[in-house]
From Swiss-Prot:
It holds the Pfam family Whib. The keyword 4Fe-4S applies. Residues 25-82 form the 4Fe-4S Wbl-type domain. This is Transcriptional regulator WhiB7. Keywords: 4Fe-4S, Antibiotic resistance, Cytoplasm, Disulfide bond, DNA-binding, Iron, Iron-sulfur, Metal-binding, Transcription, Transcription regulation. The keyword Manganese does not apply. Belongs to the WhiB family. It is found in: Cytoplasm. It comes from Mycolicibacterium smegmatis (strain ATCC 700084 / mc(2)155).
Amino acid sequence: MSIAMTAPTTGVAPMTCETRLPAVPCHVGDPDLWFAENPGDLERAKALCAGCPIRVQCLTAALERQEPWGVWGGEILDRGSIVARKRPRGRPRKDSGGNPAAA
């Protein structure tokens, strides 16, 4: 006589990220938007986060993990800290500012 060992069935589907979380903007849109280089794209990602039901938890967790960069909880993070806005890559444009030597 042999006894087959089987896992008990509960009738409940396994939890996935999609079933645990509501349709949050970062899970239904373009994920690259939250890690864009363009400051305008990052501002758009921040705006999409504004009505997110898990915004506060997202930001708290990102700060605890010291996320290196991206938009988390409606804020831009750079090296684990919140920054007001991301500067574009490259050197800032030189401003002549009325300096005749710069012309």
